[in-house]
A protein has these predicted regions:
Chain B
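Extended catalytic/binding region for NAD+/ADP-ribose chemistry, centered on the ART fold
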Residues: 71-74
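Long, compositionally biased stretches
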Residues: 1-67, 87-93, 97-148
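Short active-site loop/helix that positions an aromatic residue
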Residues: 76-85
């Protein structure tokens, strides 16, 4: 992993289109600004991880699931 | 074409009905062709079956059946990616994680599936706010509760 030290208001450029700036440092919290093309999706890691985990949980249901569901979800 | 499915054996599907997740789903980046399968006798749940991998299928549902006021705004990027022109073309589904007992099942409201019904382009859209949980409880009136 590439490690760079930056101060407030300094930035990093990734490729031609992406700029990551350090906007403020307040105690344990760092405010980061990200400028990137719209096609680059930016997520907080814990949210993306949670979605990944949930998807894999939802994909790993037992194959006899339908028997269990019978009669449970009729409106 | 015929495909092997996780829950309902071998079935015939209409290629016109394939749903294209061009960038896959989080955790399943390589899976980009799915098909929605109705469950006989069940008007709440559907199966979202991968066409490439028979063992991969999700149970999905209309989140509005459980959360009437569920609402969010689509950003410009997804509107462009899915080439959405009309709100009426948009179908919103939530992936359900089924539990036994059924009422302990949850639905993912933070990352709904957005499908453009017109061109069958789809994407799992991660909402940027924390307003809706990944594991939202479901509560469905059971037959007993309805007095059936």
């Amino acid at each position: 992993m590439l490690v760079l030290s930056r101060k407030t208001k300094e930035a990093i450029r990734i490729g031609d289109d992406i700029e990551v700036s350090i906007l403020a440092i307040e105690g344990e919290q760092v405010k980061i600004g990200i400028q990137a093309p719209k096609s680059i999706e930016v997520y907080r890691k814990e949210i993306y991880d949670a979605i990944q985990l949930q998807n894999s949980e939802a994909a790993n249901l037992p194959e006899n699931l339908l028997t269990m569901l019978e009669g449970k979800t009729k409106k | 074409m015929h495909i092997e499915t996780k829950y309902v054996g071998k079935i015939e599907i209409d290629e016109q009905k394939l749903i294209h997740f061009e960038t896959g789903l989080p955790g399943f980046k390589e899976e980009n062709k799915f098909v929605l399968i109705d469950l006989p006798g069940n008007d709440v749940l559907q199966i979202l079956q991968s066409v490439q991998t028979s063992e991969l299928a999700f149970i999905v549902t209309n989140p509005h059946l459980f959360y009437k006021d569920y609402e969010f705004t689509l950003d410009e990027h997804i509107i462009e990616t899915l080439q959405i022109e009309n709100e009426q073309d948009v179908v919103v589904l939530s992936i359900m994680t089924i539990q036994d007992p059924f009422h302990a099942s949850t639905i993912n409201l933070q990352a709904p599936l957005i499908i453009n019904e017109r061109n069958k382009l789809a994407k799992q859209y991660i909402l940027s706010s924390d307003e809706y949980p990944v594991k939202a409880k479901i509560s469905l009136p059971t037959n007993e509760e309805k007095g059936v």
